[in-house]
From Swiss-Prot:
Segments traversing the membrane: none
Role, per record: The phosphoenolpyruvate-dependent sugar phosphotransferase system (sugar PTS), a major carbohydrate active transport system, catalyzes the phosphorylation of incoming sugar substrates concomitantly with their translocation across the cell membrane. This system is involved in N-acetylglucosamine (GlcNAc) transport.
Gene3D superfamilies: Glucose permease domain IIB
Top enzyme class: transferase
Domain notes for this protein: The PTS EIIB type-1 domain is phosphorylated by phospho-EIIA on a cysteinyl residue. Then, it transfers the phosphoryl group to the sugar substrate concomitantly with the sugar uptake processed by the PTS EIIC type-1 domain.
GO biological process: phosphoenolpyruvate-dependent sugar phosphotransferase system
Name this protein carries in UniProt: PTS system N-acetylglucosamine-specific EIIB component
Gene name in the database record: nagF
Description of the deletion phenotype: Mutant is insensitive to GlcNAc.
Organism of derivation: Streptomyces coelicolor (strain ATCC BAA-471 / A3(2) / M145)
Induction: Induced by GlcNAc.
GO molecular function, one term: protein-N(PI)-phosphohistidine-sugar phosphotransferase activity
Amino acid sequence: MASKAEKIVAGLGGIDNIDEIEGCITRLRTEVNDPALVNEAALKAAGAHGVVKMGTAIQVVIGTDADPIAAEIEDMM
């Protein structure tokens, strides 16, 4: 079974679509290459409480485990 981080990566359009990622208290702040590949429903199914899209900047609201999940995703990159 895929980890929460792997599901979030898939919702963000795959590891190759993620340009930058960092944890910020309760959010994952990301820059993606193609925002059209971001699947908000998949992110919510992975446990996101909300998704904020601003061009290529995507914020995934996931709660207090944002920092460890960001670190896990960075290790995949």
